[in-house]
Amino acid sequence: MTLYPKLILDALATVRYPGTGKNLVEAEMVADNLRIDGMSVSFSLIFEKPTDPFMKSMIKAAETAIHTYVSPDVQVAIATESRQAARPEPGKLLPLVKNVIAVSSGKGGVGKSTVAANLAVALAKLGYKVGLLDADIFGPSVPKMFQVEDARPYAEQIDGRDLIVPIEKYGIKLLSIGFFVDPDQATLWRGGMASNALKQLIGDAAWGELDYFILDTPPGTSDIHLTLVQTLAITGAVIVSTPQQVALADARKGINMYTNDKVNVPILGLVENMSWFTPAELPENKYYLFGKEGCKQLAEEMNVPLLGQIPIVQSICENGDKGTPAALNEDSITGRAFIELAENVVKQTEKRNAE
């Protein structure tokens, strides 16, 4: 028996791709690399995505069709191609990002998102290329804190992939689930759905070249944290707490989570937020509302650096609500505090990278 291309293509035309009504030939899924050598046939099937759920069944169906309609003696070799480039492996999703910093807290209400936003701004003011991902899927705040609630990221094809283009504000690339949901609508997702949404914001976005990629993580410890450490090569974690003992107890848990053998993320240091209250009219006065130097004591106990102490000043809240982070004003008390924090984060990051 002599084989020729039409025999093979006619056989493949009997195989339909599920849900389209088209056969493999009509759907242009048979690549133009069909080769025949005696009773051996080789070619590629083209799928839209490298993770096509019907890939294995289509390969099997194509082999069966050739054996049924041509000859059971034909040796078939089928390779696969995809019209969309494959997503990089976990841990290599952002090859152009130099440092990934997770900003975390053991509990809510300690100002973690405020610290993350202002750290990103301060790093940008120091001249670094910065991205900020609002990984707090169930309580996104980045759109509000940067006054971009009405912004809607768009998709653009880059290197054969459809990627989400982050919003840019104050020289920082921003993405948040808050850009895609109604701000008044609660996000009622199971852990798997939230993790998948987060993976999309990381791996399916055009982050480009960044010196620092800041992750504003959810408070506490959750599936989201595990997703982050399994998806990204995190350079280090910054733990935010107030000086209050109940907050410090949860901060200790956060440190232990990251240093767990299964997670193994270095702790860059602690940030003490709400260290003291300073009234605008009396900038030299300090009132320790939540205790004094609690984070300093915890840092010494856990043998991690104290990266900064951020005072309570009325303008921090006002600026956050207006979408103008306090770090934009380097001459203010809080602006200077956040610049110092950013400088210390850079020092600890460089130290960690040199090890």
Label the model's feature ranges:
Residues 123, 128-184:
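Phosphate-binding loop that captures ATP/GTP phosphates
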Residues 26-29, 36-37, 41-104, 353:
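Extreme N-terminal, non-catalytic leader segments
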Residues 12, 30, 97, 108, ...:
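Residue-level signature of catalytic and energy-coupling elements of molecular machines
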Residues 1-34:
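N-proximal, solvent-exposed amphipathic alpha-helical segments enriched in charged/polar residues
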Residues 153-156, 177-192, 199-227:
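Switch II (G3) loop of P-loop NTPases
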Residues 59-60, 211-212, 218-309, 314-318:
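Conserved catalytic-core segment of NTP-binding enzymes
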Residues 322-332:
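C-terminal boundary of histidine-terminating zinc-finger modules
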Residues 100-136, 270:
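Walker A/P-loop phosphate-binding motif and the immediately C-terminal alpha-helix
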